[in-house]
A protein has these predicted regions:
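Anaerobic metallocofactor- and corrinoid-dependent redox/one-carbon enzyme cores
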Residues: 1-150
Length: 150
């Protein structure tokens, strides 16, 4: 959030994606892993166009993977020049999520993540796409405004 020592949370979301054989959506838990943190660096869902074959694991189409990478540019401050996307003219992956851009556009970061079983100890039962709740960004904007007197 750019506010040291502060985290803004919201309700965990359901991951949407293919399940491994023998599992069904009602077996899955909510997204509570650390995959969202990787998105702040620009890897994972933000970089889907770098490896469109990932759709075989997380679901969707190659076109959607490319669109996710393009769309994330609308809510970030820049690009990471250390990780480039050949399919998009070697642009850097979108990096540094801007809470105000999320707030004004309504576009939520896209996250590639594992689907964990709802029962502890079972492990990964699929993979998919999830978005953090908008409430996280609303709270972050309010916290930022309070901190900086805006």
């Amino acid at each position: 959030s750019g506010l040291p020592g502060q985290w803004f949370t919201g309700p965990a979301q359901q991951v949407i994606g293919p399940m491994f054989a023998g599992y069904k959506p009602e077996d899955s838990g909510l997204d509570i892993g650390d995959s969202a943190i990787t998105e702040t660096y620009g890897i994972g869902g933000f970089a889907m166009a770098t490896a469109p074959a990932i759709v075989a694991l997380v679901g969707g189409t190659v076109e959607e993977a490319i669109d996710f990478s393009r769309q994330m540019r609308e809510i970030t401050l820049g690009e990471n020049p250390n990780v480039t996307i050949p399919l998009l003219g070697f642009m850097g992956v979108p990096s540094a999520i801007d809470i105000t851009r999320v707030g004004s556009s309504g576009i939520l970061p896209v996250i590639n993540t594992a689907i964990a079983h709802k029962d502890a100890g079972v492990g990964m039962i699929g993979a998919g796409i999830v978005h953090p709740p908008f409430a996280c960004f609303e709270k972050a904007i309010l916290g930022w405004c309070e901190r900086y007197g805006v």
